[in-house]
């Protein structure tokens, strides 16, 4: 837990609809203790609502750990957030839950806004992927939106518990992308997904080309492991479209010097994705070099 995590908890404490319980799935207790987290929860005034479950890094799984967290709850609606997503205002939970409570959707996800200190590439990426207009998505949108139909991030997302349980939750074993896999199953079963542009969190990264390579390798592995969802959906065209729009944006902003870095990051994404799609052809040692989640492959041994 870092300072952003404690900012997140402080913001949750003052929401217009405050959470009844906050279930924290913490990886490695030593980090929790070293950060003095118990004392910080007391200072924020939220400790009585927090329930902490510690696990080792080897035990963590993108799908299984989240499923375990849900099992600790008994609410008809629940919200999932990562530790680095900070609410922009006190209306996040209210706006995220609105389409669920009103029967418009069975899952919703919020808008990710780049942190003020994010670089220009990351700021454009967040604006590109998270627009300022809310909308609903169903399986019928696949012809128009392609793979973007299933795009949904549980960096900040809300779920109808009954539907979540009926669909079996997240895949119990997932290297990455468990949120999109669940969203696809929801839409394929006749459900509706809501994007809530007014439910905003600060969330951004500044990845190096190497980090983007690892991330996209794992993304592609997740898609290759679920051909029932992704076999006939292509990501490459959407990726090329985004690179072109980003390059044009940089030119308009007089930031042409950032274009080489854009191309370096994009190349890393592409090669990571290409290798991940064919991970079954790679020896185990090479998979371990390409992934950002080595413990996942150790469990596969």
Predicted regions and their residues:
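Short beta-strand/loop segment that forms part of the nucleotide-sugar
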Residues: 19-30, 53-55
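A recurrent flexible, glycine/aromatic-enriched loop bordering the glycosyltransferase active site
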Residues: 139-159, 175
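Glycine-rich, basic loop-to-helix element that forms the pyrophosphate-binding segment
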Residues: 56-73
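Short, well-formed alpha-helical segments that are part of the catalytic scaffolds
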Residues: 1-14
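Short aromatic/hydrophobic "clamp" motif used to bind/position activated sugar donors
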Residues: 78
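Acidic donor-binding loop at a coil-to-helix junction in glycosyltransferase catalytic cores
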Residues: 176-182
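Conserved donor NDP-sugar-binding/catalytic core segment of glycosyltransferases
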Residues: 90-123
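Non-catalytic, C-terminal membrane-associated alpha-helical segments of glycosyltransferases
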Residues: 218, 231-301
């Amino acid at each position: 837990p870092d300072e952003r995590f404690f900012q997140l908890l402080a913001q949750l404490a003052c929401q217009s609809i405050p959470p009844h319980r906050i279930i924290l799935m913490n990886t490695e207790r030593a980090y929790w203790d070293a950060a003095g987290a118990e004392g910080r929860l007391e200072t924020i005034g939220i400790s009585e609502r927090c329930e902490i479950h510690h696990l080792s890094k080897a035990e963590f799984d993108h799908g299984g750990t989240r499923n375990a967290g849900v099992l600790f709850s008994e609410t008809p609606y629940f919200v999932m957030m990562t530790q680095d997503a900070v609410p922009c205002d006190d209306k996040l939970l209210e706006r995220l839950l609105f389409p669920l409570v009103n029967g418009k959707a069975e899952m919703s996800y919020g808008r990710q806004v780049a942190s003020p200190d994010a670089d220009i590439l990351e700021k454009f990426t967040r604006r590109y992927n998270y627009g300022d207009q809310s909308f609903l998505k169903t399986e019928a949108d696949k012809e128009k939106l392609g793979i973007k139909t299933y795009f949904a991030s549980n960096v900040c997302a809300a779920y109808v518990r009954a539907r979540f349980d009926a669909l079996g939750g997240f895949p119990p074993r997932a290297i990455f992308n468990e949120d999109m896999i669940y969203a696809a199953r929801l839409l394929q079963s006749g459900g509706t997904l809501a994007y809530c542009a007014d439910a905003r969190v600060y969330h951004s990264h500044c990845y190096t080309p190497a980090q983007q390579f690892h991330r996209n390798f794992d993304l592609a592995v997740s898609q290759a492991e679920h051909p029932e969802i992704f076999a006939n959906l292509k990501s490459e065209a959407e990726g090329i479209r985004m690179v072109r729009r980003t390059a044009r944006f940089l030119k308009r902003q007089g930031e042409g010097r950032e274009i080489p870095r854009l191309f370096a990051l994009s190349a890393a994404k592409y090669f990571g994705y290409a290798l991940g799609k064919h991970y079954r052809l790679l020896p185990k040692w090479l998979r371990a070099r390409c992934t950002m989640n080595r413990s996942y492959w150790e469990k596969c041994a």
